[in-house]
């Protein structure tokens, strides 16, 4: 596979139809997630599929802020969370509390829901949609979401290994035609794709293999990269939100205040001088005196 395909999203349309598609391949951006946390194999695959899905979904909606894909349940896997920004930067994490089974999604997450949140940034209203997890595949659960929340015919194919996270999406645009013949044919051909083909074939080779008899137009690739949004400023704001007394209690109990970003594992450490400076610089009308 060429470097042109790596860490990129490729959009395509079937000419003279109401069907559009996307192919996404995450390499270095996916590796950056795995380098920061050791996950059991079944969870690595699920998180990789979620990363690929989030990249695909970010192209189906216009966002100025960020899109979050979240799985939350009471099973061995308690949380999967992926964030994609309007600048095509990504980060992701997962949390688990017991051995993660190899079997389907419902066994892994238990009673769970999938949520998609669009945060438009400053001044905008956040949108969130959700669907219960009733399928054994993440891609099928996302198809349920689109059928119920967006009322858009959507099909996805997702896969991941330790090197790549990949996905393909087909979507029928609303209101352009009452004839489903094109849609049904393109989905039927898409169903013949294998995980190995998604992982190994170049974009042009894969699209030719699937749709060489279709009139297809491929757009320029859109690059994606790993980038964490954590910063000293955000941690400062979080600590101020806890309040001076609680932060001082942590400091006295542990000797320092340490905050680890769950996405990138960056550690932010504060000593007594840092804490006093932090609260002295805040907008609080009164800063409690230093305890001795």
Predicted regions located by residue number:
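Interaction interfaces in information-processing and related assembly proteins
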Residues: 2-220, 288-291
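Cys/His-clustered metal-coordination modules, chiefly Zn-binding fingers
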Residues: 189-292
């Amino acid at each position: 596979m060429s470097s042109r395909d790596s860490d990129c999203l490729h959009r395509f349309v079937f000419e003279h139809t109401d069907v559009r598609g996307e192919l996404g391949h995450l390499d270095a951006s996916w590796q950056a997630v795995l380098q920061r946390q050791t996950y059991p194999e079944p969870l690595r695959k699920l998180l990789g599929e979620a990363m690929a899905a989030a990249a695909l979904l970010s192209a189906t909606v216009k966002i100025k802020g960020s899109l979050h894909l979240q799985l939350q349940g009471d099973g061995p896997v308690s949380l999967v969370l992926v964030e994609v920004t309007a600048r095509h930067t990504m980060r992701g994490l997962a949390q688990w509390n017991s051995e993660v089974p190899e079997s389907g999604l419902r066994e892994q997450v238990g009673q769970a829901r999938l949520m998609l949140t669009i945060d438009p940034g400053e001044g905008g209203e956040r949108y969130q949609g959700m669907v219960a997890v009733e399928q054994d595949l993440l891609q099928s659960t996302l198809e349920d979401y689109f059928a119920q929340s967006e009322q858009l015919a959507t099909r996805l194919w997702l896969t991941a290994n330790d090197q790549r996270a990949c996905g393909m999406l087909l979507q029928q645009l609303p209101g352009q035609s009452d004839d489903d013949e094109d849609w049904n044919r393109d989905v039927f051909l898409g169903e013949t794709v294998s995980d190995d083909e998604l992982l190994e074939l170049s974009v042009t080779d894969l699209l030719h293999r699937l749709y060489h008899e279709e009139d297809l137009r491929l757009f320029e690739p859109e690059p994606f990269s790993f980038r964490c949004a954590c910063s000293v400023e955000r941690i400062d704001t979080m600590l101020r939100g806890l309040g001076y007394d609680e932060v001082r209690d942590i400091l006295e109990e542990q000797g320092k205040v340490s905050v680890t970003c769950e996405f990138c594992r960056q550690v932010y450490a504060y000593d007594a001088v840092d804490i006093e400076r932090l609260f002295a610089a805040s907008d609080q009308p009164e800063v409690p005196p230093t305890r001795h």
